[in-house]
């Protein structure tokens, strides 16, 4: 291949990459614009989800939630969904009082009180609270 051909091919690829990056930036900007809307008082919504597997093939999930709670309430979990719960539940770490598990699952506070587990049969879902 000639040197001139390689230069044109490289220039073409570079232009395509710049176009894709520019287009992607506009899509992300547009998506962020839609996220800025107000959450109804007393409700929560998921604004970002993250999911991966570690080397032990255990699936790890995390989410970012936006809540607008009434006075005396904070962000929590009810029936495996983000919700506003009484602040004393979180302050006292009485996690199972906010009913975080699905119907039919058993809730247990973790020994270090930094979260809870929901179990049904041999399936266990563990949630750790991070601030």
Swiss-Prot record:
A single cellular component GO annotation: cytoplasm
Tissue spec. comment: Brain-specific.
Protein name, per record: Chemokine-like protein TAFA-2
Pfam families, per database record: TAFA (PF12020)
Function per UniProt: Has a role as neurotrophic factor involved in neuronal survival and neurobiological functions.
Organism listed in the record: Homo sapiens
Keywords from the named record: Cytoplasm, Nucleus, Signal
Keyword Nucleus: yes
Record-stated family: Belongs to the TAFA family.
Chief localisation class: cytoplasm
BP GO annotations: memory; visual learning
GO molecular function terms noted in the UniProt entry: receptor ligand activity
Signal peptide (from-to): 1-30
């Amino acid at each position: 291949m000639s040197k001139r051909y390689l230069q044109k091919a490289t220039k073409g690829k570079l232009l395509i990459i710049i176009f894709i990056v520019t287009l992607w930036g506009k899509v992300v900007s547009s998506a962020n614009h839609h996220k800025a809307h107000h959450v109804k008082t007393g409700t929560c919504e998921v604004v970002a989800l993250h999911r991966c597997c570690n080397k032990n093939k255990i699936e790890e999930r995390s989410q970012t939630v936006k809540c607008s709670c009434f006075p005396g309430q904070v962000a929590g979990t009810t029936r495996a969904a983000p919700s506003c719960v009484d602040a004393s539940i979180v302050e006292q770490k009485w996690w199972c009082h906010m009913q975080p598990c699905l119907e039919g699952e058993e809730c247990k506070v973790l020994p270090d009180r930094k979260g809870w587990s929901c179990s049904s049969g041999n399936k266990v879902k563990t949630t750790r609270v991070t601030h």
